[in-house]
Amino acid sequence: MFKESFKLSEISDFLGGQLSGDGSITISEIKTLLEADKGSISFIYNKKFKKDLEATSASAVLISKEYINHCKVDYILVANPHESYAKLTQLFSGNLRKKISNKNYADSYSKDGIEIGKNVFVGKNVIIEKGTKINSGSFIGDDVFIGEETYIHPNVCLYHSVRIGKKNIIHANSVIGSDGLGFANNEDSWEKIEHLGSVELKDNVEVGASCTIDRASLGATILNNGVKLDNQVHIAHNCNIGKNTIIGAKTAIAGSTVIGEECLIGGGCGIVDNIKIEKGVRINPMTFITKSIKKPGIYSGGSVVLEHSKWLKHITIQKKQFDD
């Protein structure tokens, strides 16, 4: 799906950056600072990751001037590392949206109890294990893996490189592996960050109807064993949902948030990005969560229904109490 590698000098030229180091190094992946290793390139655009920069094992890093003294590996100096990272993802994504594959391999899967419904499209290099059933109108992209005895309802879309474990159930019209909300600001417009990661559903996961699970920008969005989603749940890029957690309808979880094991999250909740919710937490419906929850318990945040004038008075009193 993606070109395998580039020379560091090629990357520097593509970005219009200033290379410090060995331009002949081969770069095959983009990774976060802590995950990066030999053959990968990373980036830093926020000072809170300065310690990660100092500890990185990346072959090279995209940096701005303020981080030069903290970088112990080869680097490419650029004006805006976040924008340059976005452009680099576009380079690595290659021909992702430049052509459409019309070759359907659905007829290749007719043994081991596998059943493929009418008008199902299956891309190349797909692995479908025994006993799996895929209903009419579903789309299975290139390089997808589907574990044994999984049941896929009609009109499900699995984007390229998604991995589905054993005995999963995916209900109608759900989309797994779409891009997350990722853009870098370049002053007068937004530069798209191509999402080079994937989605991994472990074993015994159930996804309700019309859910969306976005692929990771790098790495994987993960739903661990036994996770259950109600209808119309949104899981953003790079989230990690702990095993046996249940999430009610129309809840939306923003990017890179980690939900612990055995949590119960009611319907209609909103959970912001980059927070962590501890194991065993219960969240009542319509709660808006803006910070990490560090101890188990039952949490609520919805407001009671009042006439609007009374609601305004109620909120004003509450605000004064918190201000005091």
For each predicted feature, which ranges?
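Structural signal for interior beta-strand "rungs" in well-ordered beta-sheet cores
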Residues: 43, 104-307
